[in-house]
């Protein structure tokens, strides 16, 4: 560890805390009190403070003390306090570690002792509850505070957590969301890792301290600028990092921290050379990996593993479908199928592979380091010793080929695999080798939930918009009314048996009754009168009487005398305390100065209570819904597009209460006649809600037909799906008529294109179309001959032919045709053995320019280079044939991505300067090229994250009510309370002509 981290794991935590207790705290006390003596004694994980104020002695026992790594051990918990930088330009930033943060916490609490005060033991102990202050500070808070439980999942998770840094101010002045903000800056280089960051909204906020950096005296200093010392511990442990796209390397590093530790560690065959000699570091297994398609089971990141592989990790439970695996290069997927060893594809010598991952996305994700690792891993396995490939200095292609030759292995890194089921060879050589994989903490048994009652999955505002736009008013009433678990005493909270189907709800929605109660707490009445909503001012007789009449927080020109009680709300408790304080002040006839201060405090607490009482979200649908379930998804070949596979336990949980007895035949019959609604958040389009007929399947994952993935924006890398069961006859009818796959296509015929074969299925059809026999085979899947006799069978050609089937033969026939085409294409891809050559690019054109090549020269030739690639038709080439076919058939990727991966590219640095890279990512970038590329890659990733954050707001703006009556205005307002208070003051009547207002109240049927 000392060699990996020459400055120590994280010495700044303990140093900062020691400085607080030994220097800064006594200095503070000396300024506020007559401090005569102060000392600290530390032993193990505790310290003892002794101090004298005037002539009074105080001893503080059992004060927490962090260990050498900066970890506090309290009541069986391990806690760490993240350092915080006040500027994203870290070379200029002040960094506050635990000691500085604790000082800020304690300083306002230390009162100044008045001159002449007589100190007693009791007074001093109550004046300076130092031990309690420190314990209060060290209590983790919700919402991303700096005090956090240590992530002890594995060794890397722990080390990286202790070496984490938080940046407070991340937006550049004047920057728009996602624009020139939260990206790498020059002052961060050498101080934090440019690769390793969170993948969500904390992307620019949380950083991993570089191996060569240290926090000292309130600054973060770069002590070593050698390339591998600029990385975090985890990123530096990725071999061939310079062959990976920066965002994929980010994913790889993050997922290594999520790997479950096996019973027995196994070191990787291919090392980066920076790994410490710590057995607990190794959480994965070296798996013989084939980068080929294996039909439907490897579609959209699905994994096929062998039975031996399922057992080899030594976890408490063997792997099963739904388990998520990842490697160090950012490839991830869930197990879709576990095959007997003798059914797996096998090497020429009969060795079965352990894991199959599809080649189809490799040229677009550009995490080519895994291919190089596979090649070198075979050498390491052959030699029986580890091989080293540093992050920035792994062996080049010629060295790898020579090593392969010297060890009796194919110098291409590829060989023809055989199908384990019948021994037949695949049609072309495939890349295969040993790659280090780990199992993430996201195990399927922990992710599957099924709730006939509570706790339940939530349906929110976006789901409401989708249902509203489809005209599913009955489902809205059922989802946000009948099946809402917000209503106290709901009969569906703990249902053992229900009379199915239930009647359609007729009462008010829980969200509206909740709104009425909230408004009443601040003196506004909202009552239905003859299908209209009347607003008026009202008293709150059972509420908290205010000590003084106060301006209404929503309508300052009106006075309020009482508020509703919500004793469990912190905002109400604070208001109650402020009210009691001013009551005492007034009763004691205190000076106006004190009375005015107390009045201002009461007004502030009242405003905070009002804000908490009616935030904008209170005007939006969002309910925990009974009879809901959730699980990880995986593909299944026996399902058609109208079906979804529910795990056995989930099926019984949802449908069991609808049956008089636990009878499997009755269950299957009921499921076959029923619809369930599948939903994958965020619900940004109509097809994010799909109705399926459910069938029982073994295991702990929800199974999908692969053709529906694009409709749900889902893939098989760990995505989860929520499932909801309608309980009313009308809701059930709407599910089938409005939300089924057929219903969506009948409403919008273009949706059929999204169901057409894609990814490996489309590649396989294009591959078949290269020969007359294969083309005839594809054409035979149609009810009549529709495919052209020449030209590439690309996405457009297939989609047009399928649309013709719909027009001539009807939608059911078109869907059946898609099923046949998808199965044919997937099988063709599986048999092809198509892969990505680890040394691809030897046949690609190179720019013809003087040396050194300039940016302008590259731009002059880029279009010509792209044209040269697109003019090629050698799809059976061992060099880039499969990737060329994927691009030209519209399967995946672009010619620009082929150029970037194989030829060269122009990238943008942190100062927006252009830099030409004269070789493809597959060859490996120099350290400087990696760091420059990372800036642009992360900027793009942050823009995507920022856009995702804005999608909900954009959807709200697009779908919000357009009316001008009270409810519609309040739904649009950032302060709905003001809208309601003014309506009450004017005694307004909302006629409820707006559809959103009627649905919100529960009058959809009116």
State each model region's role.
Residues 77, 94, 98, 188, ...:
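Helical mechanochemical/support elements of P-loop NTPase systems and associated helical scaffolds
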Residues 91-101, 116, 280-286, 294-297, ...:
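Core catalytic machinery and nucleic-acid-binding channels of phosphodiester-processing enzymes
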Residues 286-290, 294-296, 301, 324-325, ...:
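OB-fold/S1-family RNA-binding modules
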Residues 36, 53-57, 63-67, 174-180, ...:
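Phosphate-interacting basic helix/loop segments used at nucleotide- and nucleic-acid interfaces
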Residues 331-337, 370-372, 408-416, 434-454, ...:
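Long amphipathic alpha-helical segments
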Residues 1-203, 207-304, 314, 320-323, ...:
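Conserved N-terminal architectural modules of multi-subunit, DNA-dependent RNA polymerase core subunits
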Residues 470-471, 480-492, 868, 872-1006:
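Extended, low-charge hydrophobic alpha-helical regions
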């Amino acid at each position: 560890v000392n060699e990996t981290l020459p400055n120590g794991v994280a010495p700044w935590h303990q140093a900062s805390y020691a400085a607080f207790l030994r220097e800064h705290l006594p200095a503070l006390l000396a300024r506020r009190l007559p401090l005569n003596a102060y000392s600290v004694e530390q032993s193990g994980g505790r310290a003892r403070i002794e101090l004298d104020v005037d002539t009074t002695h105080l001893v503080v026992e059992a004060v927490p003390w962090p260990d050498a790594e900066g970890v506090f051990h309290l009541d069986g918990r391990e806690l760490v306090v993240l350092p915080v930088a006040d500027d994203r330009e870290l070379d200029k930033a002040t960094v506050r570690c635990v000691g500085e943060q604790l000082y800020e916490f304690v300083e306002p609490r230390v009162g100044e002792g008045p001159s002449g005060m007589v100190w007693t033991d009791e007074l001093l102990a109550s004046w300076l509850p130092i031990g309690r202050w420190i314990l209060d500070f060290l209590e983790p808070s919700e919402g991303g505070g700096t005090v956090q439980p240590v992530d002890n999942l594995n060794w890397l998770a722990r080390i990286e957590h202790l070496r984490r840094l938080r940046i407070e101010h991340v937006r550049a002045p004047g920057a728009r969301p996602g624009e020139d903000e939260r990206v790498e800056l020059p002052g961060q280089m050498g101080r934090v890792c440019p690769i390793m960051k969170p993948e969500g909204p904390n992307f620019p906020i949380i950083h991993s301290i570089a191996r060569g950096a240290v926090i000292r005296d309130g600054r973060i200093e770069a002590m070593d600028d050698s390339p591998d010392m600029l990385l975090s511990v985890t990123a530096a442990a990725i071999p061939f990092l310079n062959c990976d796209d920066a965002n994929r390397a980010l994913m790889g590093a993050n997922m290594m921290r999520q790997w479950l530790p096996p019973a027995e560690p196994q070191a990787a065959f291919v090392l980066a050379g920076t790994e410490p000699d710590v057995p607990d570091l190794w959480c994965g297994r070296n798996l013989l990996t084939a980068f080929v398609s294996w039909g439907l089971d490897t579609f959209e990141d699905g994994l096929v593993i062998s039975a031996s592989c399922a057992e080899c990790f030594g976890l408490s439970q063997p792997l099963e479908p739904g388990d998520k695996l990842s490697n160090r290069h950012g490839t991830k997927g869930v197990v879709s199928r576990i095959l007997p060893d003798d059914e797996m594809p096998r090497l020429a010598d009969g060795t079965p592979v352990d894991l199959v991952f599809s080649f189809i996305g490799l040229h677009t994700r550009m995490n080519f380091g895994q291919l190089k690792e596979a090649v070198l891993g075979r050498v390491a396995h052959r030699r029986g010793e580890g091989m080293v490939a540093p992050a920035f200095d792994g062996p080049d292609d010629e060295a790898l080929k020579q090593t392969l030759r010297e060890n009796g292995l194919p110098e291409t890194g590829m060989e023809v695999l055989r199908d384990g089921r019948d021994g037949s060879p695949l049609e072309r050589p495939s890349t295969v080798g040993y790659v280090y994989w780990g199992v993430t903490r996201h195990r399927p048994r922990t992710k599957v939930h099924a709730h006939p009652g509570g706790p339940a999955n939530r349906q929110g505002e976006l789901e409401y918009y989708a249902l509203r736009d489809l005209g599913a008013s009955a489902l809205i009433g059922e989802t946000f009314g009948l099946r809402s678990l917000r209503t106290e005493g709901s009969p569906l909270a703990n249902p053992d048996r229900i009379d199915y189907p239930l009647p359609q709800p007729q009462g008010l929605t829980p969200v509206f009754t909740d709104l009425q109660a909230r408004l009443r707490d601040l003196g506004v009445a909202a009552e239905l009168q003859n299908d209209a909503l009347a607003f008026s001012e009202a008293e709150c007789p059972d509420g908290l009487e205010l000590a003084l009449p106060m301006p209404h927080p929503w309508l300052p020109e009106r006075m309020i005398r009482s508020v509703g009680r919500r004793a469990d709300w912190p905002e109400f408790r604070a208001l109650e305390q402020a009210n009691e304080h001013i009551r005492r002040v007034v009763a004691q006839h205190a000076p106006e100065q004190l009375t005015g201060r107390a009045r201002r405090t009461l007004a502030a607490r009242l405003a905070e209570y009002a804000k908490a009482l009616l935030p904008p979200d209170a005007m939006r649908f969002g309910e925990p819904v009974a009879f809901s379930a959730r699980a990880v998804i995986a593909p299944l070949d026996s399902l058609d597009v109208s079906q979804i596979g529910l795990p056995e336990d989930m099926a019984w949980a949802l449908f069991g209460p609808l049956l008089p007895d636990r009878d499997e035949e009755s269950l299957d019959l009921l499921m076959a006649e029923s619809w369930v609604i599948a939903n994958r958040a965020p619900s940004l389009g109509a097809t994010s809600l799909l109705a399926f007929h459910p069938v029982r399947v073994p295991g702990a994952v929800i199974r999908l037909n692969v053709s529906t993935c694009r409709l749900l924006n889902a893939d098989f890398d760990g995505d989860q799906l929520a499932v909801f069961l309608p309980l009313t006859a009308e809701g059930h009818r709407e599910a089938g008529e409005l939300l089924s796959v057929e219903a969506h296509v009948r409403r919008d015929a273009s949706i059929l294109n999204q169901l057409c074969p894609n990814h490996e299925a489309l590649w396989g059809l294009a591959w078949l179309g290269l020969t007359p026999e294969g083309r005839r085979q594809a054409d035979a899947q149609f009810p009549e001959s529709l495919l052209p006799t020449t030209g590439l069978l690309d996405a457009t050609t297939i989609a047009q032919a399928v649309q013709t089937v719909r027009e001539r033969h009807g939608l059911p026939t078109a869907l059946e045709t898609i099923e046949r085409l998808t199965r044919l294409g997937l099988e063709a891809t599986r048999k092809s053995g198509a892969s990505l050559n680890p040394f691809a690019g030897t046949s690609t054109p190179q720019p013809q320019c003087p040396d050194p090549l300039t940016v302008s020269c590259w731009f002059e030739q880029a279009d010509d280079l792209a044209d040269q690639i697109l003019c090629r038709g050698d799809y059976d080439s061992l060099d880039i044939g499969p990737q060329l076919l994927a691009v030209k058939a519209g399967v995946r990727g672009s010619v620009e991505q082929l150029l970037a991966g194989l030829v060269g590219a122009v990238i943008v640095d942190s100062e927006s300067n252009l830099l030409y890279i004269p070789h493809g990512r597959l060859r490996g970038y120099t350290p400087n090229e990696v760091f420059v590329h990372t800036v642009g890659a992360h900027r793009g990733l942050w823009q995507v994250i920022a856009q995702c954050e804005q999608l909900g707001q954009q959807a709200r703006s697009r779908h919000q009510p357009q009316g001008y009556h009270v409810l519609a205005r309040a739904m649009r307002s950032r302060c709905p309370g003001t809208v309601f208070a003014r309506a009450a003051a004017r005694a307004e009547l909302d006629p409820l002509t707006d559809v959103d207002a009627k649905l919100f109240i529960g009058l959809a049927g009116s």
